[in-house]
């Protein structure tokens, strides 16, 4: 564990990302621990500048190991990773002043207050002007909602409060890149919403945010781009809209709102719709992958059979649908 900002049969690999202006770029990045455990396997990843990038996968999929290599905390077995155009870990001294990071939870001095912890972190930055330290610390506390608890000893903080304090430490100075590993871990729903709002504000100010999470809701609500890992390998990456769009064509789920669900089920079944689920006033089903009926013709068939159609169309595809369709695996959804 380190303080914020401190150095310290599987699917085929995803396609190598194209060159360009990236805040973080990995090529063939691999980490094998002693004993042969392969934690990250030939990872090719590109995080565009200005994006809010969601790094998604089940616990143990290699996300944190990837972040630790990117931040220079551990060396890769093979492959390369660049952060803000600098090779890591060689460029760590040039890169870290431009990066805020919260990895595996903050390392705090339990005997110090929240405010004094931030003072210590700020004093450790050789570029920080001591004359404006108090203002920076106060602004960081205010931004994460810890002003009222600033005088309390850190050991008395809840897990969620410690997460907030670690995030405040990462925000003591303006950063080009903010790396957050499970930033809402331990927070209540209100705290989660506040952190997500803060991430959006930082992105609006021009900060690239790299957000690791196992919560689909978290990625879907705040991210512009996403990548998903499983068992140390990258399965897919792209914009959130692209991933959802790919799943939409794969799933083809139809939804009909009607007060006549039984009749709707009968007609839809006759036209090849499968996996039909009927509720009080709604029917959903899967359109066939091949020779699917035209949606307009299907709607006309329902109306022609006397079914009162109130709404008709494809369901909105969530990021959960996208990743299940693309990877065949589920993730935690609630956030």
Regions found by a protein language model. Give the residues of each.
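ABC-family P-loop ATPase nucleotide-binding domain
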Residues: 1-32, 329-335
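C-terminal coupling/interaction segments
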Residues: 2-9, 290-335
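ABC transporter nucleotide-binding domains
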Residues: 21-26, 31-230, 236
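A generic structural signal for secondary-structure junctions
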Residues: 100, 123-126, 245-249, 269, ...
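Residue-level "edge-of-site" marker
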Residues: 154, 281, 315
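ABC transporter nucleotide-binding domain
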Residues: 196-289
């Amino acid at each position: 564990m380190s303080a914020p900002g401190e150095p310290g049969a599987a699917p085929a690999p995803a396609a190598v990302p194209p060159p360009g202006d990236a805040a973080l770029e990995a090529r063939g990045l691999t980490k094998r621990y002693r004993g042969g455990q392969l934690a990250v396997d030939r990872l090719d990843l590109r995080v565009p500048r200005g994006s809010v990038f969601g790094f998604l996968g089940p616990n143990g999929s290699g996300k944190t190991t990837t972040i630790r290599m990117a931040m220079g905390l551990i060396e890769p077995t093979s492959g390369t990773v660049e952060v803000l155009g600098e090779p890591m870990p060689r460029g760590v001294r040039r890169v870290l002043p431009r990066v805020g990071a919260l990895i595996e939870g903050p390392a705090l001095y339990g005997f110090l207050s929240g405010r004094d912890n931030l003072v210590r972190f700020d004093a450790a930055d050789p570029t920080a002007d001591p004359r404006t330290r108090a203002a920076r610390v106060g602004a960081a506390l205010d931004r994460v909602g810890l002003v009222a608890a600033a005088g309390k000893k850190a050991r008395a903080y809840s897990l969620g409060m410690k997460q907030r304090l670690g995030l405040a430490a990462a925000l003591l100075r303006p950063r080009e890149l903010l790396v957050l590993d499970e930033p809402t871990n331990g927070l209540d729903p209100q705290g989660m919403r506040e952190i997500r709002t803060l991430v959006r504000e930082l992105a609006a100010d021009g900060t690239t945010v790299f957000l690791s999470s196992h919560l689909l809701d978290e990625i879907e609500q705040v991210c512009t781009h996403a990548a998903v890992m499983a068992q140390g390998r990258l399965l897919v990456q792209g914009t959130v809209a692209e991933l959802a769009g790919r799943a939409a064509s794969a799933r083809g789920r139809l939804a009909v709102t009607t007060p006549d669900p039984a009749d709707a089920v009968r007609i839809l079944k006759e036209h090849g719709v499968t996996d039909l689920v009927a509720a009080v006033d709604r029917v959903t089903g899967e359109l066939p992958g091949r020779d699917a009926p035209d949606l307009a013709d299907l709607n006309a068939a329902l109306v022609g059979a006397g079914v009162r159609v109130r709404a008709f169309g494809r369901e909105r595809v969530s990021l959960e649908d996208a990743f299940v369709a693309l990877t065949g695996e589920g993730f935690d959804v609630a956030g």
